[in-house]
């Protein structure tokens, strides 16, 4: 699990599994990918080197990732568009999650392809799978939003977001306020059979971004 900067956690992870050549899942924290496009592009280059190290050790890799900062950025941008253009309907958060999966997956798969080619590895494809998750509609998490998304705000900004947009805002570890959304427990992955097929065909699969849609 990567929750901080990408380089050291990935190095430690590699050292721990070097003697266990098997199929592994790597989870990249959304915060570790940065808050801007340049930060994300720099982070995925470091991450790609560590992942390809694992592949050279004989591991098959599936990559999952968070999306808190990224989906918040996308959601804010789409909400601003709706406010400026009355003919533009509001974009559901589910669609914003799909956008974030594609945005993060695009950078990750390009960084992985580049690193594979740099090492002369040409026979391992990389694919991003937009992934949906089944949940229980009665999950109490829908009544108690807890997943932070987007950027940090001051208390005054958070109060404005609550009043103007109906967001649920909570203080986040003394660093400021962030919007929180429901995070129900996953029941099953809709696209799991396709993911399994891709992995069995020796693809590096980037999937379940942000926990799925």
Residue spans for each PLM region:
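N-terminal, well-ordered alpha-helical segments
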Residues: 49-52, 59, 69, 102, ...
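Short, Lys/Arg-enriched N-terminal segments with co-localized hydrophobic residues
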Residues: 1-17
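Glycine- and acidic-rich phosphate- and metal-coordinating loops
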Residues: 27, 131, 213
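N-terminal glycine-/serine-/threonine-rich phosphate-binding loop
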Residues: 18-64, 73-83, 92, 197-202
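Short, active-site-adjacent cap segments at secondary-structure transitions
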Residues: 32-34, 68-72, 134-138, 213
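Histidine- and/or cysteine-centered catalytic micro-motif in compact active-site loops
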Residues: 209-211
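Glycine-rich, histidine-containing beta strand-loop boundary motifs that form or position
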Residues: 65-67, 130
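Ligand-binding beta-strand-loop-alpha-helix segment within the catalytic cores
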Residues: 81-207
